[in-house]
């Protein structure tokens, strides 16, 4: 039976479909607010009958996260290989995308069964790495940050792990709308910088699919006392980059990302 679903994140619509014995696609609950009926910008076909015979050679590897995922360039296509100690050295999932990441197939090593729920083709880390690749194609930036909307004003609290993003989200609970406490997307729209919530939260599970014009950026750090100091220019751009997810494997994507960071800090008070 054919199943399909569409999910929109930061004005990018992902169309998910597959042909299989069950339609019980296991989309995480956090995606429920992101379901939509729009025309897909990115089409993903999920396959649950084993991995394709694609050779994953060391010389074709363009990036290794040293964790669970690696990227390869094979015959002009980008291949995501996901591994886990649970399954040994061989990938448990492979995703193959065309040059612009608009079409892809996600292959799963474990076949589905009529009783089982199908694993989410947007399961971590593929969803977030794919978003980084898409944004690097002139679309925007994926930031390690908490995003808050307060009466139509967007506040971005950027920080790496343990810097206080989730704490900031909890402080704002009941005072403003939490877009996400850990992953925010920045995009240019109508001559302004906008920020968008994503499904990929940290410890705080309050998320929103909405976007809001970005008014201020705050770079979080621990200190003995509360305080604010203005950051501008190259330093602000470098701080934003250090708290983002840049496409380190893509020279053109990095050039766009660096330019976009400059553009953001030139348009928004930090």
Question: Which functions belong to the PLM regions below?
Answer:
Residues 163-165:
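Conserved glycine(s) of the Walker
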Residues 168:
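Hydrophobic positions on the alpha1 helix immediately C-terminal to the Walker A/P-loop
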Residues 1-156, 161, 171-177, 184-270:
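A noncatalytic interaction/capping subdomain that flanks phosphate/NTP-handling catalytic cores
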């Amino acid at each position: 039976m054919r199943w399909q679903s569409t999910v929109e994140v930061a004005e990018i619509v992902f169309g998910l479909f597959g042909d299989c014995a069950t339609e019980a696609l296991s989309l995480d609950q956090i995606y429920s607010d992101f379901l939509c009926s729009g025309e897909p910008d990115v089409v993903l076909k999920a396959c649950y009958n084993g991995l394709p015979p694609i050779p994953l050679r060391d010389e074709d590897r363009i990036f290794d996260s040293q964790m669970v995922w690696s990227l390869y360039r094979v015959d002009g296509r980008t291949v995501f290989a996901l591994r886990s100690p649970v399954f040994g050295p061989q990938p448990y999932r492979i995703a193959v995308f065309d040059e612009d990441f608009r079409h892809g197939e996600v292959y799963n090593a474990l076949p589905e069964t009529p009783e089982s729920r199908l694993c989410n083709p947007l399961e971590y880390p593929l969803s977030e790495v794919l978003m980084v690749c898409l944004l690097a194609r002139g679309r925007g930036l994926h930031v390690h940050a908490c995003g808050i909307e307060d009466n139509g004003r967007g506040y971005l609290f950027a920080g790496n792990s343990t810097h206080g993003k989730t704490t900031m989200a909890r402080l704002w609970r009941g005072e403003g709308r939490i877009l996400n406490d850990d992953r925010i997307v920045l995009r240019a729209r109508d001559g302004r910088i906008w920020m968008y919530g994503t499904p990929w939260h940290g410890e705080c599970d309050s998320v929103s699919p909405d976007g809001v014009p970005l008014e201020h950026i705050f770079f979080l750090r621990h200190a003995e006392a509360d305080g604010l100091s203005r950051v501008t220019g190259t330093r602000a751009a470098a701080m934003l980059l250090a708290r983002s997810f840049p496409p380190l494997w893509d020279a053109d994507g990095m050039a766009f990302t660096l330019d976009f960071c400059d553009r953001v800090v030139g348009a928004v008070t930090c």
